[in-house]
């Protein structure tokens, strides 16, 4: 089968990012913050159809936290509510840069051990601040994931990060199948345009399983371009709290997942089952 037709055939992943570090109750009443709220949203999304969930932890006051104990409560609640869905924990450097803090959730074990963990491949600026990711911190997180048997889910905001994925592959820190989220629409990163999506996808390591994500008002545009290019979709209130560009209607996580399924239907695609991605990760 020609490469393009092959890329447009079969199931694609849907990654739910329900919470993030930025949305607050003051911004939207729909963002899930507690373990039970997150689990409820994941279960509702799983009933519609998702492949994996990308988790951020909040403390009792709704403030982002790196603490393993909080992640344990969230992961436990999600495992119970949606046992098939693959779980990804964040190692973000947006609020803290210390390797020990960022890696704390990677020590979860048993049924709480995450399937995947995020790995941002360079430092970057958001409109309100920086996410600092020094090369040795990235390598340190990758080594811990490799030792723990946790698959890195690469977070890529620009073409330099794509190149660094190849560097880590050559160094043996990404020995297995590559899983990546490509982010478009950030003020200091790739934009949601055809040329930038195409170039980023073209330069990914061979055989990568990738999803497209759009920040803020670019969520639907980036998702549409990703599906048209043969990729999956990342969706959720972490990336944008509004359902429409006019910002007249606040979204919920299930609403956003339902819209992705309508998008897939138009392109004659289906959501990848969790077990299909699970098998792909261990090929």
What function would you assign to each model-found segment?
Residues 116-238, 251:
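Catalytic alpha/beta core domains of metabolic enzymes, predominantly
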Residues 38, 45, 56, 117, ...:
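Conserved, mostly hydrophobic/aromatic
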Residues 26, 51-74, 126, 183-184, ...:
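Glycine-rich, proline-tolerant flexible connector loops at the mouths of alpha/beta enzymes
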Residues 50-60, 87-91, 155:
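Short beta-strand segments at enzyme active-site cores
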Residues 35, 40, 65-132:
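Active-site beta->alpha loop and helix N-cap motifs at the rims of alpha/beta catalytic domains
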Residues 16, 63-91, 140-147, 199-207, ...:
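Alpha-helix-loop-beta-strand connector modules within alpha/beta enzyme cores
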Residues 259-283:
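Mid-to-C-terminal alpha-helical segments outside catalytic/metal-binding sites
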Residues 4-30, 118-125:
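N-terminal small/glycine-rich loop or linker at the start of catalytic domains
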């Amino acid at each position: 089968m020609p490469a393009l037709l092959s890329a447009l055939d079969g199931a694609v992943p849907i990654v739910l990012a329900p919470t993030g570090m930025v949305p607050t109750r003051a911004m939207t009443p729909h963002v899930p913050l507690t373990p039970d709220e997150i689990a409820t949203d994941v279960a509702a999304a799983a009933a519609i159809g998702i492949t994996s969930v990308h988790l951020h932890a909040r403390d009792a006051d709704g403030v982002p936290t790196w603490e393993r104990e909080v992640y344990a409560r969230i992961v436990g609640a999600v495992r119970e509510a949606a046992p098939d869905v693959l779980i990804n924990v964040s190692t973000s450097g947006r609020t803290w840069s210390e390797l020990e803090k960022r890696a704390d959730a990677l020590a979860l074990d048993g049924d709480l051990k995450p399937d995947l963990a995020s790995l941002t491949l360079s430092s970057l600026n958001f409109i309100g601040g920086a996410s600092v990711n020094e090369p040795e911190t990235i390598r340190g997180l990758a080594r811990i994931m490799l030792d723990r048997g946790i698959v890195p889910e690469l977070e890529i905001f620009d073409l330099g990060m794509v190149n660094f994925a190849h560097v880590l592959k050559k160094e043996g820190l990404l020995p297995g199948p590559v899983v990546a989220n490509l982010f478009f629409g950030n003020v200091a990163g790739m934009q949601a345009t055809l040329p930038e999506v195409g170039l980023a996808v073209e330069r990914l390591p061979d055989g990568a399983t990738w999803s497209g994500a759009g920040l803020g008002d670019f969520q639907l545009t980036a998702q549409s371009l990703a599906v048209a290019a043969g990729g999956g979709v990342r969706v959720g209130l972490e990336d944008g709290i509004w359902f429409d560009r006019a910002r007249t209607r606040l979204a919920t996580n299930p609403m956003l997942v339902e819209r992705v399924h309508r998008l897939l239907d138009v392109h004659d695609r289906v959501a990848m089952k969790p077990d299909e991605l699970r098998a792909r990760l261990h090929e």
